[in-house]
Regions:
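Extracellular glycan-recognition/adhesion modules and their associated mucin-like linkers
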Residues: 552-584, 601-632, 650-680, 696-705
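Short loop/beta submotifs within extracellular cysteine-rich repeat domains
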Residues: 153-154, 187-188, 386, 410-411, ...
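Well-ordered beta-strand positions in beta-sheet-rich domains
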Residues: 497, 536-539, 599-601, 648-650, ...
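Kelch-like beta-propeller repeat domains
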Residues: 24-551
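Bacterial N-terminal signal peptides that target proteins for export
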Residues: 1-9
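Bacterial N-terminal signal peptides
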Residues: 8-18
Length: 705
């Protein structure tokens, strides 16, 4: 996307010319969308939607967030490895579809393990990711990561939490601070079985805390609550929470309702139960950690599915659905029509038309097989009823997630670690509003298109000028909170309709006047035509300091066809060289013999398997390339007919892990990097240690020829 300045020109009656700067528009990139091309559209897509083919994904994305630039960050496992470890961030650019250049991975982006953490955006534009941990790292569940979306870098230079926050929920409150709720010590999933012992051992965190960059984390000692965050029914486990129109925080923990005031030391109010307790066997209420919920309109929440307190509890799932209205002094609770399918560990998304799409889940606990639920269901607030939509191909249960993309489609990924499946894949659900019926078949609907905004940085109660590429009959202008989703709860989504007027191709809308309705952060702005078809969404900031970052971080570049040597940054005077076809590091300098100099010289070639990456051809053994083979690295003669050879001989340049030079990630084995160990060059999976960072960082220097 880009901006330019338009000049307003006026001629006065006597011929004088005045020129004034009227506005600096934010121009919207309406280039083709690869996610909308080449679709095999079924005949009923206009009524049931459709799913994409299953696409590969580099890791198990049990956490997903839409960044301000429109890219999607996922994390939860290492690359290609089905273990619990939140130290690898993957950045996917939807504008590139699913081709080989669409993903950019930050392995061990920081010395914090964000597995089963919580995340929200700060007013600075950075995403705060706090709590979590896994057995793979043993890192503290009191730690935080600050992810800068303008540079796609992460750091752990954030004050530590006061309490362990594994499985906590974090939201942004109206003044821009980050509020952490619930959570516990890692892996105390059975806390509900002996609440007294869990409390005695300080296993669960019953006091909220709040973060500001200037002060760090502060406990809200006046809001300690066993009712809201205690071990009973695992109420500490990812509480569902939202800022209410009153400015207080409303929450659902298992079957309990509560309200929190974050002023001063905080204060909490118990609002009672709205259903029976989860997992009692005689009924299947839509409560507990295994349920899902979304704010589909200001102060209105849809709570669906569940009936379990933990992923290991063998309980029948609920199909019940409840609307909770928190616009008054007391919540109003009423059941709406049940879903067709009972579900635990489903995901819910509010879409631009104001409906709610529920996907995934199981009819019993986290079972796949015959219990897996593949069809999506769509709930209409206008009718209070559900429509069964198209079927997915992959079971998405515990540790799966969904996210609304700017183009109005829904990304569905993850599931596993643990579970009956480990899903290194993703699917895209295309809701019915993206299609129209034509001659007995479904085709992509013509969509309104936003040409420009007066700014992508908006304040409260301000006018938003939206210009369309062509005039259209419009029904709505809406804002939807950019997603941050994990464990069946999207903590940042909310839906607001904006008042607007239309004159030709110009729409004048007004942003929310209250921070309570739309806390500071990032929102997708859509316009809907009279047929209910949305434009592509435009990401804007509201009450935030953010300005648009680049979509992709700068990739380190090498000069193709240059003669170079690879110099390990932590062994000055050493170069990578081949000896008897084995890649080693050795002391090589201008005074070394000619053979040593030639053995350490390589020609940079365009990657044999990926033009965005590189291959290294030996100078004195033409046709031989550095190639990985079962962790060993050496010279192998090129085999043009062997795709596996090309992948194993291709390395993608990354910023040096220790901050210096380059690191080289295998194209064939994502997450594995060239590293020297005991003077031998190897390909190893990044383990997060400072030594690995040093051993895998190289300077690229001119060859000594």
């Amino acid at each position: 996307m880009k901006t330019h300045c338009r000049l307003s020109v006026a001629f006065l009656a006597w011929g004088a010319l005045t020129v004034s700067v009227a506005h600096a528009d934010y121009l919207v990139d309406n280039a083709g969308d690869p996610l909308m091309t080449g679709l095999s559209i079924p005949a009923d897509a206009a009524t049931r939607g459709m799913w994409s083919a299953v696409k590969p994904w580099p890791l198990i994305g049990l956490h997903a967030a839409l960044m301000p630039s429109g890219v999607v960050m996922t994390f939860g496992s290492p690359l290609g490895n089905g273990v619990q470890d939140g130290r690898t961030f993957d950045i996917w650019d939807p504008a590139k579809g699913f081709d080989g250049t669409a993903h950019y991975t930050l392995p061990q982006a920081q010395q914090v393990d964000a597995f089963c953490s919580a995340g929200t955006f700060l007013k600075t534009g950075a995403m705060l990711i706090s709590g979590g941990s896994s057995g793979a790292s043993g890192y503290s569940s009191n730690a935080s990561t600050l992810f800068d979306p303008s540079t796609h870098t992460a750091s752990n230079a954030v004050a530590a939490l006061n309490l362990p926050r594994w499985y906590g929920t974090m939201i942004t409150v109206p003044d821009g601070r980050a509020l952490m709720l619930g959570g516990a010590k890692p892996y105390v999933v059975d806390a509900y079985k002996d609440p007294a012992a869990a409390i005695a051992n300080n296993n669960v965190s019953m006091t909220p805390e709040i973060f500001a960059p200037e002060t760090g984390w502060t406990l809200l000692s006046g809001a300690t609550s066993r009712t809201a965050f205690g071990p009973d029914d695992n109420r500490w486990w990812y509480p569902h929470a939202w800022v209410a129109p009153s400015g207080s925080v409303f929450g659902i923990s298992a079957n309990r309702l509560w309200s929190l005031d974050v002023a001063g030391n905080g204060a909490i109010r118990d609002l009672g139960t709205f259903k029976g307790a989860p997992g009692n066997g005689s009924t299947t209420p839509n409560v507990g950690a295994t349920s899902t919920a979304v704010m589909y309109a200001p102060g209105k929440i849809l709570q669906v599915g569940g009936n379990g307190v933990a992923n290991q509890q063998p309980t029948a799932s609920s199909n019940q659905a409840t609307v909770i209205d928190i616009n008054g002094t007391q919540p109003s609770v009423r059941d709406t029509a049940p879903m067709t399918y009972p579900r635990q560990w489903a995901s819910s998304i509010v879409t631009p038309d104001g409906k709610v799409v529920v996907t995934g889940g199981s009819k019993f606990a986290d079972d796949a097989g015959t219990s897996a639920v593949y069809p999506a269901e769509i709930w209409s607030p206008a009718t209070g009823r559900w429509t069964v939509a198209a079927k997915a191909a992959v079971y998405r249960g515990y540790h799966s997630t969904t996210l609304l993309l700017p183009d109005g489609a829904i990304l569905s990924t993850g599931g596993g670690v643990p579970g009956p499946v480990n899903n290194f894949n993703a699917e895209v659900f295309y809701p019915p509003y993206l299609f129209q019926s034509s001659g007995g078949r479904s085709v992509l609907a013509a969509r309104p298109a936003i040409y420009s905004l007066n700014s992508n940085k908006q304040d409260y109660g301000a006018g938003i000028t939206i210009r369309l590429t062509r005039s259209a009959s419009l029904s709505k202008v809406v804002l939807i909170g950019a997603s941050s989703s994990t464990h069946s709860f999207n903590s940042t989504q909310r839906y607001l309709e904006l008042p607007f007027t239309v004159s030709g191709t110009t729409i004048t809308a007004r942003s929310p006047s209250s921070r309570n309705l739309a806390p500071p952060g990032y929102y997708l702005l859509y316009v809907m035509d009279a047929k209910g078809v949305p434009s592509r969404g435009v990401l804007i900031s509201l009450g935030s300091e953010w300005t648009a970052p680049p979509v992709q971080p700068a990739q380190p570049k090498l000069t193709v066809d240059a003669s170079v040597s690879l110099a390990p940054v932590n062994f000055p005077g050493y170069l990578v060289r081949h000896k008897n076809y084995v890649a080693t590091i050795d002391q090589v300098s201008q005074t070394s013999d000619a053979l040593a100099k030639l053995d350490s010289a390589f020609t940079v070639r365009t990657g044999l398997a990926d033009a965005a990456c590189y291959s290294f051809e030996s100078r004195n053994f033409p046709g031989y390339f550095l190639k990985a083979d079962n962790g060993a690295v050496g010279l192998k003669i090129r085999n043009n007919a062997d795709a596996a050879y090309a992948g194993a001989a291709t390395f993608c340049a990354r910023k040096g892990m220790n901050g210096t030079g380059y690191s080289f990630e295998s194209r064939a084995y994502p997450g594995q990097f060239l590293r020297h160990q005991n003077y031998v060059l190897q390909l190893q999976t990044f383990d997060g240690t400072p030594l690995f960072k040093d051993d895998s960082s190289f300077s690229v220097v001119p060859a000594l020829l």
